[in-house]
Amino acid sequence: MSGSTGERPFSDIVTSIRYWVIHSITIPMLFIAGWLFVSTGLAYDVFGTPRPDQYFTQERQELPIISDRYKASQQIQEFNK
């Protein structure tokens, strides 16, 4: 016979009203926070990725592909011009 860890069974937690009161608020808030994080553009600033309209400029319409791994930093500087 296995010992008890003293934790509540998962079925008791999921069927409790307190669980659903807390999670009916927090789960939708997580989705709203994620949507705001992306829709305001903060995700682009935090992770340093270019916005969709910054991938191709008027001067550069080709794909910015690194072809030489040893001169990668030089190629990136050329792409950013």
From Swiss-Prot:
According to the record, cofactor stoichiometry and binding are noted as: With its partner (PsbF) binds heme. PSII binds additional chlorophylls, carotenoids and specific lipids.
User: Which PROSITE patterns does this chain map to?
Assistant: CYTOCHROME_B559 (PS00537)
Superkingdom of origin organism: Bacteria
Q: What is its main location?
A: membrane
Q: Which residues bind heme?
A: H23
Q: Keywords for this entry?
A: Electron transport, Heme, Iron, Membrane, Metal-binding, Photosynthesis, Photosystem II, Thylakoid, Transmembrane, Transmembrane helix, Transport
- What single Pfam family name could you report for this chain, choosing any that match? Cytochrom_B559
TM spans (from-to): 21-35
Q: Which GO terms describe its cellular component?
A: photosystem II reaction center; plasma membrane-derived thylakoid membrane
Membrane topology type, per the record?
Single-pass membrane protein
What task does this protein carry out? This b-type cytochrome is tightly associated with the reaction center of photosystem II (PSII). PSII is a light-driven water:plastoquinone oxidoreductase that uses light energy to abstract electrons from H(2)O, generating O(2) and a proton gradient subsequently used for ATP formation. It consists of a core antenna complex that captures photons, and an electron transfer chain that converts photonic excitation into a charge separation.
Please report which protein family the annotation says this sequence is part of. Belongs to the PsbE/PsbF family.
Q: What is this protein called?
A: Cytochrome b559 subunit alpha
Q: Which organism is the protein's source?
A: Rippkaea orientalis (strain PCC 8801 / RF-1)
Q: What is the lineage of its organism?
A: Bacteria, Bacillati, Cyanobacteriota, Cyanophyceae, Oscillatoriophycideae
